[in-house]
């Protein structure tokens, strides 16, 4: 097994360390660094990035770090550290924009935390770059093509976002996927929604 590349390793360590701090002083960190809807009066500009370093539970942290390792490691080796960081930032910002829009429409006062937006951007990129790679998710443990995996999870996120009240920021996840899609198109020199040239 190849070693974890540096940016992915540092992010995994930083997120884990911050989560440990959350267990000690949760109110302080969440009030300053979670992504709060502007209407609450608790919003600060840096929160559109910092929220991605906080997590809501041990399981939340575990699955995000697992996904970061599974998909991010290979993409970092492919792109290099600088481009990889730029891509993660795009995913985090796009997810934040989507979540702020949804909370504004729904008049929500609940903050958002987690690297899931960046993770879904990585997932989308992996599916675009390695569409025929076979992967086996933890649940369901069924081998499937990366492209199929992305479509299934994207569809589930949309369905749960439209119908569910699970306390999960589904539209932030979808926003991360959109941000990842737009970055890949930009790097390829393609306009966002034009058809692929033959």
Can you annotate each of these PLM segments?
Residues 1-198:
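A detector for small-residue-rich transmembrane helices and their helix-helix packing motifs
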């Amino acid at each position: 097994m190849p070693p974890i590349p540096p940016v992915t390793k540092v992010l995994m360590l930083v997120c884990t360390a911050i989560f440990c701090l959350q267990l000690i002083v949760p109110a302080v960190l969440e009030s300053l660094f979670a992504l709060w809807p502007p209407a609450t009066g608790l919003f600060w500009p840096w929160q559109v990035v910092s929220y991605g370093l906080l997590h809501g539970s041990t399981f939340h942290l575990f699955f995000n770090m697992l996904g970061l390792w599974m998909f991010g490691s290979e993409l970092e080796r492919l792109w290099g550290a600088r481009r990889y960081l730029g891509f993660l930032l795009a995913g985090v910002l796009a997810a934040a924009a989507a979540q702020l829009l949804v909370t504004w429409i729904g008049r929500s006062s609940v903050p958002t935390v987690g690297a899931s937006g960046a993770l879904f951007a990585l997932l989308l990129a992996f599916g675009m770059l390695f569409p025929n790679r076979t992967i086996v998710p933890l649940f369901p443990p069924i081998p499937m093509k990366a492209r199929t995996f992305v479509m299934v999870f994207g569809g589930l996120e949309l369905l749960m976002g439209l119908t569910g009240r699970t306390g999960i920021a589904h539209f932030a996840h979808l926003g991360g996927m959109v941000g990842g899609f737009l970055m890949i198109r930009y790097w390829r020199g393609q306009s966002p929604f034009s058809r692929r040239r033959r």
